[in-house]
UniProtKB/Swiss-Prot annotation:
It comes from Methanococcus maripaludis (strain C5 / ATCC BAA-1333). GO terms for molecular function: ATP binding; FMN adenylyltransferase activity. This is FAD synthase. InterPro entries: Archaeal_FAD_synthase (IPR050385), Cyt_trans-like (IPR004821), FAD_synth_RibL (IPR024902), Rossmann-like_a/b/a_fold (IPR014729). Its cofactor is a divalent metal cation. The gene is ribL.
């Protein structure tokens, strides 16, 4: 019997509980979890800033996490490329994905005769630092006007 493969993707810059929630959710739906790590260049284009942690380091960190079986870097030219190579049974999307984005993904994959189940993590983890941006804001708040003691 073939292994059921799930894929999820993200920047995974500053790890927080939301990342772990998504990875654990994904692993519950498959035998093997492959994580696609957004490339530094792609993140800069989309978010207007480079990740704090370089892509190769983010890949190594994600690969070391218990639910993750394998991590790969995303494509610089075609966001579907790693998905088409992996051919997952399930794609896990984060809570910030819209219905439009989900329908667009289904449509794009169907053009390649790929029809995975697409599941969405429905809610955000409720905690003070549930996003990388919140972590960065807190670091700035605590340290921007103080001398760093190294």
């Amino acid at each position: 019997m073939e292994k059921k493969i799930a894929v999820t993707a993200g920047t995974f810059d500053l790890l927080h509980p939301g990342h772990f929630n998504t990875l654990n959710f994904a692993k519950k739906h498959a035998d093997e979890l492959v994580v696609i790590i957004a490339r530094d260049e792609t993140v800069k284009k989309i978010k207007g800033r480079s990740p704090v942690i370089p892509e190769e380091q983010r890949k190594v960190m994600i690969e070391a996490l218990k639910p993750v079986d394998r991590a790969v870097l995303g494509s610089l030219t075609n966001k579907l490329e790693p998905i088409l190579e992996i051919r997952p049974d399930v794609i896990i999307l984060g809570p910030d994905q819209t219905t439009y984005q989900i329908n667009e993904l289904k449509s794009q994959l169907a053009k390649h005769f790929l029809y995975p189940e697409i599941l969405k993590v429905e809610e955000y983890v409720k905690c003070p630092f549930h996003s990388s941006y919140d972590i960065l804001k807190e670091i700035v708040r605590r340290w921007c006007c103080k001398e760093l003691k190294v």
